Structures are given as C-alpha cells and as structure tokens.
C-alpha cells in the first residue's frame, strides 16, 4: 500500500487524539448493538441483553480498549500492517473462528464513532484516509482466511 504524506499525517493525528479507553468501548458496543449477531463471539462476556447492558459491560469495555491498542500497532507499522497482524489473523481465523466480514462491520462502527468525536474536522479527505487505513487493517486481519 502506498501512503501519501497527507494520509500518514492524518492517521497519526487521528489516533493521537483518540482516548482509546473511551472510543474502543464505544465502538465495540455500537457493533454489538447494531449487528447483534456479532454477540455470538462474546458469549463469555455475560449480559449483552440490550444496549444499556452492553454499554455498562466491563468486558466489552476492556476488549474495546484492547482493539484500539491493537490498531495503534498498525498506526506505528503502516508500511507493514499485514505482517504486523499476521498472528492476530491466525488467532481470529483458526482459534476464534470469527467471520472476517465482522472486521469490516467493526471498522464501519469505528468510523462512525471517530466521525462523531471529530465533527466538522472529519472532512471527506480525512474520512478517505481513515477508511483507506481501516480497509488495509481489515484486509490484513482477513489474510489468513484466503
């Protein structure tokens, strides 16, 4: 993947301004509410009965933060995201058996959460860079499935 200077700077700027322990949980909670079938991967998380329960679930919060910290690894390794995520791809495909389409759903939820936080600063150009980054992440996580 070729990154322009603008794309690199934009991705680094976005992630430098995110509160991982707020945005991560909000993103995962949104995904679990909007796409309830994704809850099947989180059976050990306890009560996911409704949006309020999901939002207050400590395990959802913790895993959401873990996801954002995982994305931070991609930000720091933008030229080699595929290899950066090789082990995660194997884990999610072979051990956890996660449908790779769910990575795209989560990426879409993150885009919405980020857009809401950044407001008018999340211009079309910024969104294009962010979605390009997330598409590379999603592709890298799904690599083991091919």
From Swiss-Prot:
Q: What tissues is it present in? A: Red blood cells.
UniProt KW Iron keyword: yes
What's in the keyword line of the UniProt record?
A: Heme, Iron, Metal-binding, Oxygen transport, Transport
**InterPro entries in the cross-refs:** Globin, Globin-like_sf, Globin/Proto, Hemoglobin_b, Hemoglobin_oxygen_transport
Q: Which GO terms describe its cellular component?
A: blood microparticle; haptoglobin-hemoglobin complex; hemoglobin complex
| Residues reported in the UniProt entry to bind heme b | 63, 92
Single GO molecular-function term? Answer: haptoglobin binding
The UniProt record lists the Globin domain at 2-146
- Subunit and interaction comment: HbC is a heterotetramer of two alpha-1 chains and two beta-C chains.
* PANTHER family named among the record's database cross-references: HEMOGLOBIN FAMILY MEMBER, HEMOGLOBIN SUBUNIT EPSILON
Q: What else is known?
A: This fish has three hemoglobins: Hb1 (major, about 65-70% of the total), Hb2 (about 5% of the total) and HbC (about 20-25% of the total).
Which family would the database say this protein is a member of?
Belongs to the globin family.
Name of this chain's protein: Hemoglobin subunit beta-C
| Lineage of the species this protein comes from | Eukaryota, Metazoa, Chordata, Craniata, Vertebrata
């Amino acid at each position: 993947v070729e990154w322009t200077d603008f794309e690199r700077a934009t991705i680094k700027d976005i992630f430098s301004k995110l509160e991982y322990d707020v945005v991560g949980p909000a993103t995962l909670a949104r995904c679990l509410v909007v796409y309830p079938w994704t809850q099947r991967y989180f059976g050990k998380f306890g009560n996911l009965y409704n949006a309020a329960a999901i939002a207050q679930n400590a395990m959802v919060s913790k895993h959401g933060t873990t996801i954002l910290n995982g994305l931070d690894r991609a930000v720091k390794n933008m030229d080699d995201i595929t290899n950066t995520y090789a082990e995660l791809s194997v884990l999610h495909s072979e051990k956890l058996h996660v449908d790779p389409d769910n990575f795209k759903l989560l990426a879409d939820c993150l885009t919405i959460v980020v857009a809401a936080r950044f407001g008018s600063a999340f211009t079309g150009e910024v969104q294009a860079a962010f979605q390009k980054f997330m598409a590379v992440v999603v592709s890298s996580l799904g690599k083991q499935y091919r």
